[in-house]
Amino acid sequence: MEELRNDWTLKEVEILFSLPFNDLLFQAHRIHRQNFDPNQIQVSSLLNIKTGACPEDCSYCSQSSKYDTGLEREKLMEIDLVLQQAKEAQDIGATRFCMGAAWRNPTDKSLAKVILMIQGVKTMGMETCVTLGMLTQEQAFILKEAGLDYYNHNIDTSKEHYSNVVTTRNFQDRLNTLESVQNANIHVCSGGILGLDESQTDRASMLRSLSNLRTHPDSVPFNLLVPIPGTPFENIEPPTESEFVRTIAVARIMMPKSVVRLSAGRTKMGEAMQALCFFAGANSIFYGEQLLTTDNPNINSDKDLFARLGINQKKVNNLQSV
């Protein structure tokens, strides 16, 4: 078994990225097999419980109030409707239900409503995850007391590149919230986005920041940017398929016991690319035809993909594996 490390240097990570592709994938797959069933995928479902009008200026995001993307603002969903969506997700095989709100940070009033959603989903026997923006330490403790399993808070990109992507917050703000979540003993879900005009060194730095947290994130989601018309990044050149797969492989090597999730952008990935990602160490996806405001493969398409690749869908929750 590989030793869990929290002391990676940037040079070490860059050396991993520079390995011949086949050597890198061989090393990543070996580590993946040591820690997980390589033919098993955990499935989550994501629901946007509050859409648009976010005051942040993330250059990639359709939900920012700073850009004209044609997205209509929607208020926080009613609890009954959220629970109905959770039940539908469970019926198609999702074991974790994630709820996202386009906020800079939740108000106490909004948080109280989200807590009722969390408690309702928990009664169904599903894992719960929310992404609500920045949290205070007190809010993190409140969410823990409510029974929250996971908190998603992506760092998006490297510390060095961050100000080129977002200016209404800084990289340390992200780390502060992750620290509050870890202090509350909530499982951390944190990853990034590829396709933000970042360099390979930026990808290496991002993975270094994630792996050098106090404890590794339990889940590490990777998004392939879906360019949104009206945002500053609408014409950004995407990474190549091999660059994306390399990032998955390096993440698996650096964080051997974390669940690595393919998130937004899978509609742009063919079967071979997804298969390479699974071989390199990805072992989770989101089910459902919509991820926040971007398209996602339909469920039957994913089931067919699993069947062709001989992949089994994880039937129970994932907490015992991380």
Swiss-Prot record:
Catalysed conversion reaction: (4R,5S)-dethiobiotin + (sulfur carrier)-SH + 2 reduced [2Fe-2S]-[ferredoxin] + 2 S-adenosyl-L-methionine = (sulfur carrier)-H + biotin + 2 5'-deoxyadenosine + 2 L-methionine + 2 oxidized [2Fe-2S]-[ferredoxin]
One Pfam assignment: Radical_SAM
Cofactor needs: [4Fe-4S] cluster; [2Fe-2S] cluster
Single GO biological process annotation from the record: biotin biosynthetic process
Cofactor annotation remark: Binds 1 [4Fe-4S] cluster. The cluster is coordinated with 3 cysteines and an exchangeable S-adenosyl-L-methionine. Binds 1 [2Fe-2S] cluster. The cluster is coordinated with 3 cysteines and 1 arginine.
Keywords, comma-separated and alphabetical: 2Fe-2S, 4Fe-4S, Biotin biosynthesis, Iron, Iron-sulfur, Metal-binding, S-adenosyl-L-methionine, Transferase
Every Radical SAM core domain range: 39-266
PROSITE patterns according to UniProt: RADICAL_SAM (PS51918)
Residues that coordinate or bind [2Fe-2S] cluster: 98, 129, 189, 261
Biochemical pathway: Cofactor biosynthesis; biotin biosynthesis; biotin from 7,8-diaminononanoate: step 2/2
Family annotation (InterPro entries): Aldolase_TIM, BATS_dom, Biotin_synth/BioAB, Biotin_synthase, Elp3/MiaA/NifB-like_rSAM, rSAM
Residues involved in [4Fe-4S] cluster binding: 54, 58, 61
GO molecular function, one term: 4 iron, 4 sulfur cluster binding
EC number: 2.8.1.6
Protein family membership: Belongs to the radical SAM superfamily. Biotin synthase family.
Protein name: Biotin synthase
Organism (species): Ruthia magnifica subsp. Calyptogena magnifica
Top-level taxonomy: Bacteria, Pseudomonadati, Pseudomonadota, Gammaproteobacteria, Candidatus Pseudothioglobaceae
Gene: bioB
